[in-house]
A protein has these predicted regions:
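Amphipathic alpha-helical repeat scaffolds of TPR domains
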Residues: 21-34, 57-79, 104-123, 148-163, ...
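Helix-turn-helix repeat elements of alpha-solenoid scaffolds
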Residues: 37-50, 83-94, 129-136, 175-180
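Short coil/turn and helix-start
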Residues: 41, 78-86, 122-130, 165-169, ...
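A contiguous pocket-lining binding segment that forms or flanks enzyme active sites
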Residues: 127-165
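Canonical positions in the second alpha-helix
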Residues: 54, 98, 141-142, 181
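Hydrophobic, well-structured mid-protein blocks that either form specific transmembrane helices
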Residues: 87-137
């Protein structure tokens, strides 16, 4: 009888844990869909807040911290009037938590690179030495952790696109990176429904911008 009770108790615990995981996954999937369809900084602000609430409830999962940071960074890139340092600092805190939970994950290091770029945009001339180094180091770490991550080549191409040729950038260099990214997207399959999958459409748009020059 004791063994039966112990077995039933164990099964009950497993069932509860499974139900919680299912709820987490469903909530994440719904919020990721909202992120995919977000059009404005206001939309992204709402989505970022939702991911933060999920992260507060699921402190051992890296994905909600990742998506909260990604949403926050996208606000900074799309809203010209907003304080980019404030958003960058907020994203940095979220990224740090994601890194602590997934220290070998290419995607979270890509966000570190994106955040460095956002900080640098405030004053490119005076901040390039610090944040330019941070940007490149985080990007290279992301590439080393997963050489097949198409988003790392998209991001490298984006940096080249907006950097003059005399400083090592230019649209010819960017074009090569975007083409490489799209090659990898053809083979890319997200690990699961919560894995990052963004970037292909914007890469196509950036490649067309290179061809239009």
């Amino acid at each position: 009888m004791k063994r039966i009770l112990l077995s039933l108790s164990f099964l009950a615990v497993v069932a509860v844990a499974s139900a919680q995981d299912d709820k987490f996954q469903k909530t994440m999937e719904q919020t990721i869909t909202m992120l995919d369809s977000a059009k404005t900084p206001e939309d992204l602000t709402d989505v970022a807040a939702k991911f933060e609430r999920i992260a507060d409830a699921e402190t051992t999962k890296w994905q909600p911290y990742y998506y909260a940071a990604l949403s926050t960074l996208w606000i900074g890139y799309r809203d010209e009037k907003i304080d980019k340092d404030v958003l960058g600092d907020k994203a940095d805190g979220l990224i740090s938590k994601a890194v602590s939970l997934a220290p070998k994950n290419s995607e979270v290091y890509l966000l570190k690179s994106m955040s460095a770029s956002l900080h640098m945009m405030v004053d490119p001339m005076n901040r390039f030495q610090k944040y330019g180094t941070d940007l490149r180091e985080a990007l290279m770490t992301a590439r080393q952790l997963d050489p097949t991550n198409p988003r790392t080549f998209y991001w490298e191409g984006t940096q080249a696109f907006y950097t003059p040729e005399q400083f090592g950038g230019g649209k010819a260099k960017a074009k090569l990176m975007f083409e490489k990214s799209l090659e990898l997207y053809k083979k890319f399959k997200p690990e699961n429904s919560m894995s990052p999958h963004w970037g292909e459409e914007i890469t196509k748009q950036m490649l067309e911008a290179c061809k239009g020059e």
